Structure formats: C-alpha cells, structure tokens
Amino acid sequence: GPCWLWALALGLALGPRRCPAAPLNASAAPPERCRRPAACERLRFGSCLGSALPYAHTSTLLAADSGSQEEAHGKLLLWSGLRNAPRCWDVIQPLLCAVYMPKCEDGQVELPSQTLCQATRAPCTIVERERGWPDFLKCTPDRFPEGCPNEVQNIKFNSSGQCEAPLVRTYNPKSWYEDVEGCGIQCQNPLFTETEHREMHVYIAFSSVTISCTFFTLATFVADWRNSNRYPAVILFYVNACFFVGSIGCVAQFMDGARDEIVCRADGTMRLGEPTSNETLSCVIIFVIVYYSLMSGVIWFVMLTYAWHTSFKALGTTYQPLLGKTSYFHLITWSIPFVLTVAILAVAQVDGDSVSGICFVGYKNYRYRAGFVLAPIGLVLIVGGYFLIRGVMTLFSIKSNHPGLLSEKAASKINETMLRLGIFGFLAFGFVFITFGCHFYDFFNQAEWERSFREYVLCEANVTIATQTNKPIPECEIKNRPSLLVEKINLFAMFGTGISMSTWVWTKATLLIWKRTWCRLTGQSDDQPKRIKKSKMIAKAFSKRKELLRDPGRELSFSMHTVSHDGPVAGLAFDINEPSADVSSAWAQHVTKMVARRGAILPQDVSVTPVATPVPPEERSNLWVVEADVSPELQKRSRKKKRRKKKKEEVCPERRAGLSVAPLTPSSVPRLPRLPQQPCLVAIPRHRGDTFIPTVLPGLSNGAGGLWDGRRRAHVPHFITNPFCPESGSPEDEENPGPSVGHRQHNGGRRWPPEPLPGGSGVTRTRGRRAGLAPIHSRTNLVNAELLDADLDF
C-alpha cells in the first residue's frame, strides 16, 4: 500500500514536468525522425575539437569510418586541417561533432539537422574539390532530416580558423583565394622568394637609364624645336615621350612606401581584379600610365614607319605627302590606347605584381593579356615591319636606279639612313619577339604554376594536421616556379625599346645643337660657320627687296631663323636635288644683283598689280608682303589647268597660218622703265644669209603678220633675252630703219607685226592672256612676255 502510494505521488509529481516538453514545434520533426536506435556508450573524451560536450553518452553509429571513440577522435584531428580555411572551419565544427560524437540517450542517438549540413557546403567547397564528401557526411534526408534540433548546435567553439602562409586572413570576399574562404594570397608573390624580390627591384632600378636616354632625346628636340618640329622626325619626339612616361610609371614604386600602396590591398593581400570601390586608385593610376604610354608608343612606331615610307617615295619632288595627315596621326595614336584602357578598366582585369612593382593587365587571367597586349603588339609588328621594309627598298631603289642624279652628299646620307634603319628595325623587331617569347612562356606554364601553388597550400594544411596528431611534419615547397631570368628579359625588352628609340639623336648634329644652346644661354658667340641653303638665302633677299631698293649697296644679314641647321635626327632630312648646303662668298655677294635682275626691285613710282587700275601710294607698301602655302590640291589643279591650256594652244599649222594679230591696246598700268640695250655676245655676221631674220615670209607681204607672229620669239635677236646677235644692224637695216618708236618694246626689241594686215585688224586672238600676242613657245622670251603683259602678277 504505502509503496503504491509513493509511486503514484512520484508519477503525479513528475508528470506535469514532462508534459510541456512533449508538444513539438510546428517546424520540428517528430521525435522518431530525429532519433535513431543505437547502442550508447559513455564518453571517453569530454571535449570535441577543444570544446566541452554537455552530455555524457555518445555513439559511433553515425560515423561510418570509425568503429570506436578512439578512431572517431583520430578522424576529428584529421579534419582539423580545415583550420586553414577559417570560414569553413567555423561552420564545419558543429557538424563534425554532431556526427563523430553525437548525443546518445535511452538507446537513441540524435541526428543532425539538414540546416546544419547545408551550412557547410558553400564555405567548404575545397573539401568537395579536393577529397569529396564521404557518404555519411552527404546531406541526404535520411541522415540529416529537416527541422531536427541538435544539442551540439548550442555549443560555442572557442577555436577559430587561421590562414597559413602564403595565405593571410581577410574579410574581403574579393580577396579570397579560390575555395579557401576567409584567406587571400599575400601581397608578396609566393612564387618568388624574398631574395628574388630584392634582386628584381635592383634590376628595375636600371630603368633609370631609359629615363635618362629618353629625357635627353626630348630635351634635344626642345632645344632646337624650330628645326626639329618637322615630320617624320618629330614623331620620334612623341615615341620617346611615351617611353619616358611609361618608365616613370615603372620607377614610381621606389618612392617611400609606394610599392605596397600600388600592389597591395589594405588587408595585406595582392591586388587582383582592380579597380574596386573600397581601394585606393594608386594601382589604377600606375596601370594607366604604363599601359597607355606603351600602347601609344608602339602605335607611334607604326606612324613613324609610314611617314618614312611616304617621305622616301617623295624624295626629289616638291610634293609633301604628310601635309594634312599629321592630325590623323594624333587622332589614331591617342584614341586607340584610350579605348583599350577604358575597356580593361570596365572588365576589371588590372592585377598587381610585387615582382615588377606595377599593376598591369592579365597577371592572373592571361587571356586578357593576350587580347590587350600581344594582339596590338603583333599587329604593330606586321604593319610597321611592312612600311619599314618598303622604306628601305625605296631608298635602295633611288640609290641603285639613279646613281648619276645623286650628289655625293645625298648618296652618303642615303647609305647612312639605310644602315640606321636596318639597325633600328633589327633592334625593334628583336625586342618585340623577345616580348612575345616571354609572354608565351608565361601562358604555357601558368596552369602548372597554379597547380603547384595549390598543392603547396594543401601541404601547409597537412602540416597543421601533423602538428595536431604528433606525426612527422611534411616538407612543403612549390615545385614549379617561374624563372626570374625570363622576367628580367621581359623588362629588358621594354626598357631596351625605349633606349633604341632614343638612339636617333646620337649624332654629331645633336652636339652642335647643344653647343648653340649653351652659347645662347650663356650669351657667348658661336664662332662656327653657318650653313645657309641657297633657297632660303634667295627668299630672304626677296623679302628684303624694299630695303635693297632704298640702299642698293647694303649687305644682307641672315639671322638664325634663315640659317639651316640639321635637326637632331640627322640623315632623315636630306635633299637629293641640292648638291651642297655650303654657299660661296662670291655667290652670296651677288644675291642682291640677282634679285634686281629678276625684277624684284622696282622704282618707287612703279607698281605692278594684277588689276587694270593704278595702286594708290599708301597701299603700295602692302604689295611687297607675299605669304603663300600652296596645298597639294591647289598644285594639282594648277597642273591640270596648265595641261588644258597647252592642249588649246596646240593647233594645226593650217589654222595658224591664217591668223593675224590685232594691235596692242593701251593699258592704264604704268610700264616698267626702258632698260638699256646690252652688247651682243657674238661676232657680226659677214653675210646676210648668216642671220636668222628672214626679210619676207612665204605667202606674206612686207610687214605682214601671219605665221611670222607665232614664230618671231624664237628667232628675233632681242638684246636681253637673246644676246647672241649682231652688235649692229646690217646696211639694209640702216637704210630701212623699220618701225617707229611706237612699234618698239621697252627693251629695244621690235614689236611684230610692224603694222596691221591690209584689209582690217584681222582675227582677234583669244588664246593668250592678252589680245594681240601670238602664243609663247620659247622659254627664252618668258621675261619679255611677263614685262609686256599688264595683267601679270609678279
């Protein structure tokens, strides 16, 4: 009786406590689904992965690879290698303890929930990729039912993950190493040792040689910019400017703390996939400086070879092939690199490299480097090489096909230019091929390097496991690493290209430029004799014709703007038509007389103008200033006009024989003063038949025009234009003095015909510029025709 009453009281007392725990949550599974029958045994290890367990019994039923608690404990130590993946380690610890050391009570073992299993899939992708999940850890519904609470979920694990070198801990998802969430690659490239880094940085410091050479080239061009600013030589100025700026971007890393700022992120990881919103722009700025300058420089190289090719084809002519095209050079050269740079920044493929100390495209993804670096450089190699070879062939053709037309100086310059072009082309193509070879070396071996690095990271994880299990620690090393020598050769190709571009100013002309510059800066006089081109001296004399008119005895002084110096790029600016640039003193002293003889110096009261009205005195001063820049299009139209005029003048003799010439019409423009007659240069002919003046033409009477008018210029012995004439007339001429003064020209020559044809003034000629004159067929009388024509503009 009393025992029964005691049992009843105990049941009533315990009943209310257990009843509230019986109802399950709406999301929780029934108790029979969250448990499984198993043999419970007392825990031999009171902790799991360093954290104390809140229960005393467990079972090895859920861990298929363990038959005892000792085996389960050993397997947990093996799984501890995931400490090197911090985010994975944070979520996998509860799962491992719930499987290897689950709670077991009353012959029932608790099953972990589906949520606990799924939480480990994304952070622990390295397990799936490297080993694969074992079957008992796969998130199947029978092993991991939905909505089952687990006692292990309430445990707070004290051990947190860590990142073994060469990985560092970071909370930036963009810095995480693949499949290892929470860790990123350290800023210093792990494929190279610390010693190799220092050696490479010392090597990069030698890029200052490129900076010095290119800067010297730029300074040389600027010092003599007036003579150097000519295409195609000035293109070398832009090429050297591009390589100078690019070299500045490479050595910017040597400023205090600049290298880490350029190639490292704030969390100590390597910059990959720039630009990003939460990082500084130092990496992007260095990339733009280096890449944009490099691409602009190689495109300028194409423009240089094209300019050489077209300029060499136009040697010996007045045609300027580059006139009007230089603006397109700038448009193409500056716009294409800009588009490529913007495209790279848009796809965020700028990576930092601690070895080179710069940011560039495609250090991680080599496909972008092939598309944005090798493809443009390869195209430049093909196009530039074509124009360079054509230019050399053109020079060789000029030298071999026209040896008699070339002066000794021009031939020497052609030989020098061909030699320099050959050396320059060899260096340029050699450096480009070296660059291609280094990049292909990277492309073919990058996958192997990445695989070796991944194995090294896994080996470091095994070191952690060996430390936990007191097993021998394995030796970890990166088996396949890139060659430092190849990296040096690649940088040497870049710096060597810049140096080769600067060699074009390593000439004697550069020394003379700097000597003149030093004399100009210090105020000293330059005692070197000046070389003046005849064309520039004549142009200077014509421009000073007003001063020469006022003072005929004065001597011309030529300023430095008239003196023709060789530019720094000697050998490219040569004239195959001018035998020498030196001018003799006798020739220079007679320049003023030549200008006067050509009709450039006129009396003050005489004005020659293309209009038919006199020019007022106050406007005559402006008539002497003539500035013209004839474009190729205007020259082409002028040539077409001359050809059409020549075709019109070519008429048959039958039509020309019946023409007559109308008398000259008076002009309101003042005529030039009559020049004195000059003595003849031949002896007096002894016989009448020796002269070239026929008395009467066939079919015409005395004094008639006709065919004689068209041919008179080739035979009439004028005293100025044709001095090879008798010094005095024949006796017949003395008896018949000929036409009166009104029928004579200003130079003393007779005007033909002496009187109009009988029966009228004849047919008016309209082919020439003035009525009354026959077509001009002789260049010897061109001066006479110009002086006669009142409408001609001198």
UniProtKB/Swiss-Prot annotation:
GO terms for molecular function: G protein-coupled receptor activity; oxysterol binding; patched binding; protein kinase A catalytic subunit binding; protein sequestering activity. Homodimer. Glycans are attached at N25, N158, N278, N462. The chain crosses the membrane at residues 202-222, 232-252, 284-304, 328-348, 372-392, 421-440, 494-514. It comes from Gallus gallus (Chicken). This is Protein smoothened. Keywords: Cell membrane, Cell projection, Developmental protein, Disulfide bond, G-protein coupled receptor, Glycoprotein, Membrane, Receptor, Signal, Transducer, Transmembrane, Transmembrane helix. The N-terminal extracellular domain mediates sterol-binding which is required for maximal activation of signaling. Contains a second sterol-binding site within the seven-transmembrane pocket which is also required for activation. The activating sterol is likely to be cholesterol. The extracellular site is required for SHH-induced activity while the site within the transmembrane pocket regulates basal signaling in the absence of SHH. PANTHER family: FRIZZLED, PROTEIN SMOOTHENED. Belongs to the G-protein coupled receptor Fz/Smo family. Its main location: membrane.
